[in-house]
């Protein structure tokens, strides 16, 4: 039986001809039988693809041959081509859609002026060092707010954002001005959103900004469920969520009955389809699989 895997990676580097990279990446994935999503811009690449293990290995090896992609940090997880509906390779103004394509500065070394990178072990050392000095490290979630319903760092601030486009308005709202003189650690799934978010925060006067290198994925690989992370990790494919060990807590609650759950379901209203947490029992009927307070759509 063939082994299958999913890889997640990104790379910030100047790309002079994004469309040429798009054509190359599509041809490579089609040749290897891979599916997934790849976004390319003048600032780099953001990819999640899956397929047969040897094919994925060849894909990673070939992708790293591109000058700007030599040092990409690839995260591996269980899954395969069947976890994605198709192969999508597109050129966009941004590889993460914050709505600020002109603000991000990128050079051959990556994002210019972003937060200080912290490996998982360095994060723990920072927390301990600040604690000894009577300071508290603030964890700042760089994902869409709903993702944090099933997993987040302990006591993290979860901004009220439906998409990454909402972050700039949220940062400029004044809600977080009290954090501008505090040590703030941004985190997200694989690290890419925090590359941009941390630079946006620095540009708006946050003085001590860090970003979790490799994101929640790398942290979970390192500490499983024995560290500062609680719950499951939301992922944007058919798996919907993943856990780092059998000891993972279930912190999500069914919107109907408050039973523990980590499973998101789409609202059964075809014109709505909002993702909401439901337990297995409440998700079993179209009548209960509706937004409890009425659909927004």
UniProtKB/Swiss-Prot annotation:
EC number: 1.14.-.-
Coiled-coil ranges from the UniProt annotation: none
Cross-referenced Gene3D superfamilies: 3.30.70.100, Rhodanese-like domain (3.40.250.10)
SMART domains to which the protein is assigned, alphabetical: RHOD (SM00450)
Catalytic activity of the protein: uridine(34) in tRNA + AH2 + O2 = 5-hydroxyuridine(34) in tRNA + A + H2O
InterPro entries: Rhodanese-like_dom, Rhodanese-like_dom_sf, Rhodanese_C, TrhO, TRHO_N
TM segment ranges: none
Residues annotated as the enzyme's active site: 188 (cysteine persulfide intermediate)
A Pfam family assignment: Rhodanese_C
Stored NCBIfam families: PRK00142.1-2 (NF001134)
Family to which this protein belongs: Belongs to the TrhO family.
Task performed by this protein: Catalyzes oxygen-dependent 5-hydroxyuridine (ho5U) modification at position 34 in tRNAs.
Name of the protein: tRNA uridine(34) hydroxylase
Organism lineage string: Bacteria, Bacillati, Actinomycetota, Actinomycetes, Micrococcales
């Amino acid at each position: 039986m063939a082994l299958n895997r999913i890889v997640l990676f990104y790379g910030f580097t100047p790309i002079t001809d994004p469309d040429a990279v798009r054509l190359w990446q599509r041809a490579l994935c089609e040749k290897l039988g891979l599916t997934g999503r790849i976004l390319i811009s003048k600032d780099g690449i953001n990819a999640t693809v899956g397929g047969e293990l040897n094919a994925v290995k060849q894909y990673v090896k070939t992708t790293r041959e591109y000058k700007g992609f030599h040092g990409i940090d690839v995260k591996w997880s269980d899954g395969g081509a069947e976890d994605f509906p198709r192969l999508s390779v597109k050129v966009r103004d941004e590889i993460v859609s914050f709505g600020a394509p002109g603000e991000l500065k990128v050079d051959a070394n990556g994002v210019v002026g972003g937060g200080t990178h912290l490996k998982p072990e360095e994060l723990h050392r920072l927390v301990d060092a600040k604690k000894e000095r009577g300071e508290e490290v603030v964890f700042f979630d760089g994902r869409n707010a709903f993702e944090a319903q099933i997993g987040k760092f302990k006591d993290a601030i979860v901004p009220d954002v439906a998409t990454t486009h909402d972050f700039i308005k949220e940062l400029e709202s004044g809600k977080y001005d009290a954090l501008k003189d505090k040590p703030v650690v941004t985190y997200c799934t694989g690290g890419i959103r925090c590359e941009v978010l941390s630079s946006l925060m620095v540009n708006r006067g946050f003085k001590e900004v860090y970003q979790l290198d490799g994101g929640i994925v790398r942290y979970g690989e390192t500490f499983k469920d024995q560290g500062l992370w609680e719950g499951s990790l939301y992922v944007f494919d058919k798996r919907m969520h993943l856990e780092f060990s059998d000891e993972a807590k279930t912190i999500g609650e069914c919107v109907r009955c408050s039973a523990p759950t980590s499973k998101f379901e789409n609202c059964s209203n075809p014109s709505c389809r909002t993702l909401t947490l439901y337990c297995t029992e409440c998700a079993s009927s179209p009548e209960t699989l509706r937004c409890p307070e009425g659909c927004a759509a």
